[in-house]
UniProtKB/Swiss-Prot annotation:
Reaction(s) catalysed (UniProt annotation): urea + 2 H2O + H(+) = hydrogencarbonate + 2 NH4(+)
Domain of life: Bacteria
Name the UniProt record assigns to this protein: Urease subunit beta
One GO MF term: urease activity
Signal peptide: none
Gene3D superfamilies the record matches: Urease, beta subunit (2.10.150.10)
Pathway where it operates: Nitrogen metabolism; urea degradation; CO(2) and NH(3) from urea (urease route): step 1/1
EC number annotated for this UniProt entry: 3.5.1.5
Length: 124
């Protein structure tokens, strides 16, 4: 095998197998395209996106690593979300979570999203 060469296994790889999956319908209420990456905490995605943010707390897009989903202005689509694993600690991003995602962390995140006005899908 040459340095840098790829060695691909045969068969099908199923990503996020055995993890909790949720579907959520998302609408871009803004005037610009919005792109969300594979490992972004979906509940904290752009405030112009209208969807059930409470359902999305502790979840990310169920897409291959390094990819994203784009939402055009006015577009509505259903996406699959998968639970964030590992230590379930969310830091940075839009500062709505910045916590460990347990019941208390979910309540804190939900309160921050409501206070910011992000539950309505409009930027204030």
């Amino acid at each position: 095998m040459k340095p840098g060469a790829f060695q691909i296994a045969e068969g099908t790889i199923t990503i996020n197998e055995g993890r909790e999956i949720r579907e959520v319908t998302v609408k871009n209420t803004g005037s610009r395209s919005i792109q969300v990456g594979s490992h972004f905490h979906f509940a904290e995605a752009n405030g112009a996106l209208l969807f059930d943010r409470e359902l999305a707390i502790g979840m990310r897009l169920d897409v291959p690593s390094g990819t994203s989903v784009r939402f055009e202005p006015g577009e509505q689509k259903t996406v699959s979300l998968v639970e964030i694993r590992g230590r379930k600690t969310i830091r940075g991003l839009n500062g709505m979570a910045d916590t460990f995602i347990d019941e208390r962390g979910k309540e804190k995140t939900l309160a921050n999203l409501k206070q910011a006005g992000w539950m309505e899908g409009v930027i204030r």
